[in-house]
């Protein structure tokens, strides 16, 4: 019985080798494409950076110019201890937030009420406040530099770079 088992075990590697097929691309082993995977996002990973707006597009893919009033001071988001702060607008804007799976849930935003000398800054306050409300889909990439993408309920996409 042991001899028969030993004989069968000797044939097993040969059978496995014979069953392997040669790739149809001339014998080269196919390589899987390298795909960047999104990192798990949590409040701690958001709090380690200042998030500067790099790109903003509406649902049709058009740039949202109202969010780019100051080229030298892009809109910035800071996350800290359940609070979201919007910087580089006319007024100070903030609210609560929490993360649930792939959603950033933003509470009611509050703002100071300073008069803005530049109407474009007033529009910036309104434009960013309208987009940072409710449930936003959140995507986080731990690349260098890290990237944050928010997709609003209205279909707008806001892309930030972490500094």
Task: Please provide the spans of the model-predicted regions.
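Lipid interaction determinants
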Residues: 2-4, 18-163
């Amino acid at each position: 019985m042991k001899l028969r088992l030993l004989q069968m075990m000797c044939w097993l590697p040969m059978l496995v080798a014979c069953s392997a097929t040669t790739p149809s691309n001339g014998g080269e082993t196919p390589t899987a494409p390298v795909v960047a995977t999104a990192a798990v996002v949590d409040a701690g990973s958001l709090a380690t950076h200042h998030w500067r707006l790099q790109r903003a597009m509406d649902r049709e893919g058009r740039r949202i110019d109202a969010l780019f009033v100051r080229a030298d001071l892009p809109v910035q988001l800071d996350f800290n201890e359940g609070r979201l702060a919007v910087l580089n607008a006319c007024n100070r804007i903030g609210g609560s937030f929490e993360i649930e799976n792939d959603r950033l849930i933003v509470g009611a935003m509050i703002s100071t009420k300073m008069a803005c000398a530049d109407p474009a800054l007033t529009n910036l306050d309104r434009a960013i406040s309208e987009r940072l409300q409710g449930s936003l889909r959140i995507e986080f990439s731990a690349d260098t530099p890290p990237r944050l993408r928010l997709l609003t309920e209205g279909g707008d996409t806001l892309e930030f770079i972490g500094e």
